[in-house]
Amino acid sequence: IWANIAMIRAFHEANGEGEQRREVITTIFSHPSNAAAAKAAGYEVITVYPDAEGYPSLDALKAALSPRTAAIMVTNPEDTGIYNPAIREWVDAAHAVGALASYDQANANGILGVTRARDAGFDVCHFNLHKTFGTPHGSGGPGSGANAVSAALAPFLPGPRVVRDDDGTFAVAEGGELSIGAVGPFFGVIPALVKAYSWIMALGAEGLLAAAETAVLNNNYLMARVLGIPGASAPYATGRRRIEQVRYSWEELYQETGISSEEIGVRMTDFGMHYWTSHHPYVVPQPFTLEPTESYSMAELDEYAATLAEVAREARETPEVVRTAPHNQTVHHTHHDDLDDPERWAITWRAYQRKY
């Protein structure tokens, strides 16, 4: 994502509009790392909110666009699992004011072989190899990604990089004078790149499409099971299917029992189940985001849904069991009061000496 915004900035600077274009537009349900990268690059970030059904508002985008806009940076489908059907209109609107369009394809798991960034007219995009192409997650994602650009942005690609010559051999090419240079040391985590490439080549075009279709099927099957649990809901797009994930809410259960989504998630670890953490920012109350992908069987999805239902039952009948979880882990319940108080934060030794 940093490479994307760095190339966008270099493009506008090369065209003499670097000082003019100081704003980046994103959506509230796009990955927050897009807004963070733009902010770190010195841009003012404008966030567009969805309409009542959860779809990114095209009218709100057009109202925010101006000659000061450097780019739109959006995830599609968004983290709600909702695909923006007007994505081409979004890109065209950005181009109409001279801005570029950056596509965060972190949620491409459900659209492989169905649609492409090029089809919507994007100028630059990236994939999360650990979310889409079978590489290890690596505690938040290994330091390797795949960026793709239009011809207009090709001169700004990071360098040096590995290229394929006309005779099929590979070589290391230095970046040109417009290149943003090296984004990270070496070429990232090479084993992750090799594994992703091997995974793609092993599946082929038909296999990638099958993976996407299975991911969508698994997600919508799990959604039907989860929405059958009293206290769970899926805000927005009422009655409509989602792509590869859903941002659910435990708000109804929380109002009834006082047990939060975080407490339910921690209790799930006692059953050896996934503890959800990816639902920032907290726009959906008491959120939990599930993304089953193509990897799980129906039996595994049934087991997960049944465990959710069991913990929801515990929240009503034995809430202290949930509130004091985990009970079956090496580290039991910990308090996070310090994390919620900036006055106690000490992320450096100097800060620790100053505060303690």
Regions found by a protein language model. Name each.
Residues 141, 188-195:
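Catalytic-loop motifs flanking and including active-site residues across diverse enzymes
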Residues 16, 115, 165-183, 193, ...:
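Non-catalytic terminal extensions of PLP-dependent enzymes
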Residues 76-80, 185, 212:
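Short acidic-aromatic active-site loops that bind/stabilize oxyanions
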Residues 29-31, 189, 281:
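Short glycine-enriched loops at secondary-structure junctions
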